[in-house]
Amino acid sequence: MSKESARAGRTAVRGSTTGRPLMAAMDLLGRRWALRILWELRDGPVGARALRDRCDGMSSSVLYDRLRELGDAALIEQTDTDAYALTATGAALGRALKPLDEWAGSWAAVREARAGTTRDGGR
């Protein structure tokens, strides 16, 4: 890989300096509200106002920053109706995250059972 292409890889995601695709993806997806926005778009296009309503507590400025970043990363695009939708790459990410969603459900059940055991004094 040339120095120029390595440099381009490092700047593909604002704030990511590793040049490694997985680390760049984690840097982007780790930003507040980024995954939530992608999750809300999983069933189809959603307008900015509806997205903000679905993501309680997110400010308009953060929403538009994330929409721009996710668009720059080719994960979402704006439709002809000014809604936002996943690109093919964004939809592929959604499919890749499905096992994590399933794991999170199991993990929540374990945590809930553990909390119940703790409240019962271990009984």
Language model features: what each stretch is:
Residues S2-G9, G19-P21, G94-R123:
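Amphipathic alpha-helical dimerization/coiled-coil segments
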Residues G15-Y64, R68, A73-L75, Y84-A91, ...:
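N-terminal helix-turn-helix DNA-binding core of bacterial DNA-binding proteins
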Residues A74-T79, R123:
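A short, hydrophobic secondary-structure junction motif
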Residues T79-D101:
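Basic, amphipathic "hinge/linker" alpha-helix immediately C-terminal to the N-terminal HTH DNA-binding motif
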